[in-house]
Amino acid sequence: MGLEEIVTDLKGKRVLVTGGAGFIGSHIVDVLLDESCTEIVVIDNMVRGRPENLAYAMARGPVRLVNGDIRDTKLMTTLVKAADVVFHQAALRITHCVAEPGLAMAVMVQSTFDLLELCVKHNVEKVVAASSASVYGMAEEIPTTESQHPYNNRTLYGAAKAFNEGLLRTFNDMYGLDYVAFRYFNVYGPRMDIHGRYTEVLIRWMERIDAGQAPIIFGDGRHTMDFVHVQDVALANILGAKSGICDEVFNVAIGVETTLLQLAQSLTKVMGRESLDPVFAPERSVNPVPRRLASTSKAEKLLGFRARISLEDGLRGLVDWWRAERHRTGAAVHAKAAGS
């Protein structure tokens, strides 16, 4: 299917975004503001999400935040019944899945099944689902295309995402439920979780660099990732929703391989601390995949999607946001203390 067949319009649609107050979900909501949707409903249990992530969107458009859990069948029935399009972003982090595997199965597998059943029952037009490069494990094909098999994955998180992709294909065959799914590679940018227990390595590094300490690299620094800015990820989701394409999965990445050492050096440069050389620690075993590099040709060909934000520009924006956020939250803490 070619670009000339991209015909779907989100104008006037009622949209539901699960996990929509989180890192990626809130950026999807921001982009949806320009699509003239009738209503954008966000459900989030605020484990990873924050109301502040939606402040911009809620001030500009028809955005409604529901503080709830996707495991709440009664609530989800009400929300899905009123939706035309569903963006399914709710999930746990890969490290959280390791810590609480039972919860991971309930949130990431059972709740996805329940959601898809509701989408069929209430005639949802399209599901736009978040998947992950974790489904590949250590890919045998570099750059990795979407046809790479998922059998090298050795994480519960990746297994859950692969199973969810299978559910989407099955529901498309059995019930005609339209969907597109996106395998996110290494997403970064504003609104990364700086407050939670399972924070990203970039956040830890910024904290250390800002304090004049060297960033810690677990391993030898030669592991690679394919970093993609969260605003580009949001754009891919909107293009997928608006396209006439369904029953397809796409890599979302920039298509550039960056070592952890290169990332640390880029970050110290952006933060004005180039003299801080990274220090190395024993490698962790949560997700020991030595290489990540995506083929982005399928998304470019079928969706017209190409990541636009370079790593250096993206890191600069991330640092600016992080410093402003630290200043804002620090000021709020001081104000609260002064009033107590």
Which residue ranges define each predicted feature?
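N-terminal Rossmann-like NAD(P)+-binding domain of SDR-like oxidoreductases, especially those catalyzing
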Residues: M1-V187, I309, G317, W321, ...
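C-terminal substrate-binding subdomain of Rossmann-fold SDR/epimerase-dehydratase oxidoreductases
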Residues: E35, I209-S340
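Residue-level signature of the cytosolic catalytic core of signaling kinases
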Residues: A59, N152, I194-Y198, V256, ...
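Short, solvent-exposed loop/turn segments at secondary-structure boundaries
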Residues: A99-P101, L156, M192-R197, P290-R291
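Short-chain dehydrogenase/reductase
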Residues: M105, R154-A162, G196-E200, F227, ...
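A glycine/serine/threonine-rich, flexible loop-to-helix segment
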Residues: I142-P143, I194-I203
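Hydrophobic alpha-helix immediately C-terminal to the catalytic Tyr-X-X-X-Lys motif of short-chain
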Residues: F163, L167, F171, V201, ...
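Short beta-strand->alpha-helix junction loop in the catalytic core
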Residues: G189-R191, V286
